[in-house]
Amino acid sequence: MIQQYSTMRNNISMLGRFLGETISDAQGSDILELIENIRVLSRNSRHGDDQARNALLNTLATISNENIIPVARAFSQFLNLTNIAEQYQTISRHHHDHVASERSISALFKRLKAQQVPKENVMETVQKLLIELVLTAHPTEVTRRSLVHKHVEINKCLSKLEHTDLTDAERKAIERRLLQLIAQAWHTNEIRTQRPTPFEEAKWGFAVIENSLWQAVPEFLRHLNTSAVEYFGFHLPVELNPIRFSSWMGGDRDGNPFVTAEVTRQVLRLARWKAADLFLTDIQALSDELSVVKCTPEFQAKYGSHVEPYRTVVKALRSKLTATLAYYDDLLANRTPRVAEEDIITQDAQLWEPLYDCYQSLQACGMRIIANGLLLDCLRRIRCFGVTLSRLDIRQESTRHAEAIAEITRYIGLGDYAQWSESDKQAFLIKELSSRRPLLPREWQPSAATQEVLDTCRVIAEQPEGVISCYIISMAKTASDVLAVHLLLKESGVPYHLPVVPLFETLDDLRASEQVMSELFNIGWYRGVINNKQMVMIGYSDSAKDAGMMAASWAQYCAQEALVNLCDKCNIELTLFHGRGGTIGRGGAPAHAALLSQPPRSLKNGLRVTEQGEMIRFKLGLPAVAVESLGLYASAILEANLLPPPEPKAQWRTVMDELSTISCQIYRDVVRGEKDFVPYFRAATPEQELSKLPLGSRPAKRNPNGGVESLRAIPWIFAWMQNRLMLPAWLGAGASLRQAIEKGQKTVIEDMCKTWPFFSTRIGMLEMVFSKTDTWLSEHYDQHLVDPALWYLGESLREQLKQDIQTVLSLSHEDQLMSDLPWIAESIALRNVYTDPLNLLQVELLRRLRRNPDNPNPDVEQALMITITGVAAGMRNTG
């Protein structure tokens, strides 16, 4: 254990040394000396040296504008390098040699075997396993793609250095390469000059598939197969496809006017182009491998008599894939394709069938070892990615559909749909859905907004079934919200019943979700088209912003539980789609713990979950890390289904109901009820300046003129994370626990902590958040940026935070936060030395900018953006 972490510390030290050499070469020794002085003062300040703290503040307050940028960049880049070293640690040899993770697939299978779980149960559960990760563009993904590539290369160098048989010359060559990469990163602008377009975001998603997931999926399936054989003696079927990927990049138009129907069309084309490109690389490698001559009579009868029968089949696929690339090249360039559509590959079966025939023939001819190599990997990629690379979700806000239908009803003389009662809306929608005549008048010219909604539906109609995975309705509140989308799809010519998914986001909507779905299931037309399958999306971000973490997480749990029970009663196969993020305020928790804390039976039809921006990079950005992440997801789902968590006791539910009510009231009293809260929030955080950072394609606000309620959940959390108060992740939670303890419920709460995964995960995540907060830094923001008349609010919140920390420590019976996870506590302590100067510098920069808002200094603006990205790296999560 000690060796494992000393290796990581050595890597961090080495990378920091190389960064120092780079800075000295680029900026001169004086700047390096200044940076080193700030680092030492920050470290001593953290150790309680008040003199060092004052010297640190004075040094940062007097830095000249031209020196601010290199100083900010130095600390920001060091934190990025620390993240790389930590990410590498999870996949390093030392990690696997010293920590046989109890959360791994093999450890789970060993436990299942020891507990005598029948082989048939394990086989059935493995064959039903489904993990669908939905890649989404992240408004606060702060690392540019050009830097991500360099970070991947640094990771590879760390891996090479771990080999013990390196010669001095080999070691020096790797270290020289590391120095080159760190220098390249230093001389690359870490801040984008302009926001990415949705098309560029989609390219980023496809790059993750190409550089990591393409390799990781077959590798993960080999691990799963090895464990299945070792412990239970069964092989995974070749056609088993437990992993799927979907994407929102190019499909999510909720609040993003830049995602148009044409963008969606082009992203779908680009996905097919990239899939053809990746499969072509595989096919060319297979052509080299499959030089063998022996095949079965059936294979020969189907494909003809050839000296190298498999190569002949593979070469035919190579020609078709080359033609496919040319076809989509032309479409992407808005040219008429030179290749006919019948000459290209448009369906998975065109790849699967000939390659599976090769596989079966090789198996039958005694060449299992060859069949189970690259050919098996390729077959598994066809099952996972297919010729569309990933499926695409479409998402739009519920009012956009209602407004479109209201326009239609007004035009055809039926009145204003928007003013009708819910029962009248449902009656109209069901009547139109059951009718064979079209609803849309031929000569009607809709508004631009409605035209865009209809154009999107028409793009869906152009796609074969399965390319678009579902249509998600954000801010869904009623059954008519779901029926309205079905009607718009029907009227736009979609020839199949696309799954339409309500997204329940606010506290009230989560509580009403069972009633809404029950209404839908009681409609004959609806039951007739859903084929006894239903997906429902649970929103984590907006419910936490609406009600606070504790109330939101309990509402999410209860909604899932109610929906599972309802669907069981109605014989409907329910898939719960979790819209969670990386931060606690957005439902984030370590994947394994988060899944085991779900209600019993909620994962029996698999998992569908969003993976966003920076979390995609941390969890899926490297092949070995992605294999590890997929393993954690798989083991948690299998464990939840084979060794289900306990049903909550009635007493636990009562306590949670009370905690939820109290915490929601406390949270809303501050966020909604405190008259000075919005001006305090805007002054104490860089919320207003964040909008200038070219992070994602989506605007930060639904309504540019609105207050906190109009701010999207992600920037809301991002802003509070910057000033180290991290308010959305804890406000109300600790205070509600304290009140319950004061009422004599401590014994029950301790029992919940020990034996209920849902509750212990919540408390564990609270402890993690508390360990990243800093009351002194938060106070520093207030004193230099906030009107003294509003200081009382910050003082009150910090006092509450201190009390909440003591409350959580009283439950864990520890003196220090994260005592049970000393490695995380050490990681946070290490980062603080580098994050503190960025926070202090950020305050100074905000002060300078706000003093002269009409004529901002470009160097100061640039440095502020760097501190924002640096603090995000230091906190190891953004929004």
Curated annotation (Swiss-Prot):
UniProt keyword Lyase present: yes
EC number from the UniProt entry: 4.1.1.31
InterPro entries: PEP_COase, PEP_COase_bac/pln-type, PEP_COase_Lys_AS, PEPCASE_His_AS, Pyrv/PenolPyrv_kinase-like_dom
Gene3D superfamilies assigned: Phosphoenolpyruvate/pyruvate domain
Reactions accelerated catalytically: oxaloacetate + phosphate = phosphoenolpyruvate + hydrogencarbonate
GO molecular function: magnesium ion binding; phosphoenolpyruvate carboxylase activity
Uppermost EC category: lyase
GO terms, biological process: carbon fixation; oxaloacetate metabolic process; tricarboxylic acid cycle
Active site residues per record: 138, 545
Keywords of the record: Carbon dioxide fixation, Lyase, Magnesium
Cellular-component GO terms for this entry: cytosol
Family of this protein: Belongs to the PEPCase type 1 family.
Function: Forms oxaloacetate, a four-carbon dicarboxylic acid source for the tricarboxylic acid cycle.
Protein name per its UniProtKB record: Phosphoenolpyruvate carboxylase
